[in-house]
Amino acid sequence: MKPHLPMKQSVIALSVLSAISVTSLTAMAQDSKEQQAVTNKEKLETIQVTGRSLSYANSTISSEMKKQQTPMTSALSIIDNLPGVLVNEGDPFGSDEWSTSISMRGFQLDLASQQIGMTVDGISNGNSNYGGGTKASRYIDTENLRSVEVSQGTADISSRSNEALGGTLDFTTIRPRLDEKLTVSTTLGQYNARKFYTRYDTGEIAKDTFAWVSISTQQNDDYMGGSITNSRDHAEGKIISRVGEVDLTGYLSYDDAEEYTYQRIYGLGQYAQEPNWDGLTNNFSGVPYQDQAFRETWGTERENLFGYLQADFMVNDVEVSSNVYYHKNEGMGK
């Protein structure tokens, strides 16, 4: 009789069961970890990075650059702080296109040269010279400006400007807000400078459709003698909508300006002789050869209209962007 044998078999059986249980728990824990890893992986968002090489220097204005300018300054003044870009205007308000010039790494945009292109939201706005068109800054109020991208050097194939030998300035307008909002601002300054601006963001006016409209009026006297007043009335609007798989964007701008020019200074000698006078007179004398320099006769009335409609959509894996635009420029001298 061996009473201890059953006890030994029980111990062996218990040991085997314990080993099987530990193995099963380990396998279950491993399966749980693998399942959790798969779940976490499925939760990760897909991140796509697209890059392209640029042959020339590209730069974009920062929010700090915009803060340095007042609402009365033109949109051109904001890019003056970018490296390699020099903007000259007749006065701090940019009210005189005749005196405005832009230089970018040796290329010019002025009365005699047209080597730098301009676009609005990437859309061509025609010529930017004084005689046959207008600069993009005439189509955009400073408050409606989102950013300016400067492409220095010969423009790439994506530029829609017809005058981009020396580079392109692409002025981008702000997008409509998702919520309804009314913005009103008043700006006052020296030389009887004043500007009144109002913008209304509609919020969602229809399914996936948002828009904003703005109006403004501004005036300022010339800083030479205060004998004339430059004025500008401006209206602008933008709408975005998604129709099916197509993103639509529409934009319209109207500008009515009465501007008086400043005569150019010819050389340092003339500037040293009278740094605060451009050679134009403030009083009418009745003597023909003298009144050629009468400031009130050095003025122009200009109306500028610009608009576009753009559609963006996908065809299989190809992005397609198509647009139509219209611009009209009228003006006369006094």
Can you say where each PLM-predicted feature lies in the sequence?
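Cleavable N-terminal targeting peptides that direct proteins into the secretory/outer-membrane pathway or into
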Residues: 1-38
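Extracytoplasmic beta-strand/coil segments of soluble accessory domains associated
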Residues: 36-39, 76, 80-124
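N-terminal periplasmic "start-of-domain" segments of outer-membrane beta-barrel proteins
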Residues: 41-76, 96-101, 150
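N-terminal periplasmic accessory domains that precede
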Residues: 75-78, 101-106, 119, 136-138, ...
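Short acidic/polar hinge/loop motifs at secondary-structure boundaries
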Residues: 123-152, 172
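Transmembrane beta-barrel wall of Gram-negative outer-membrane proteins
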Residues: 181-268, 298-314
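Outer-membrane beta-barrel and related beta-rich outer-membrane complex signature
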Residues: 225, 249-292, 331-334
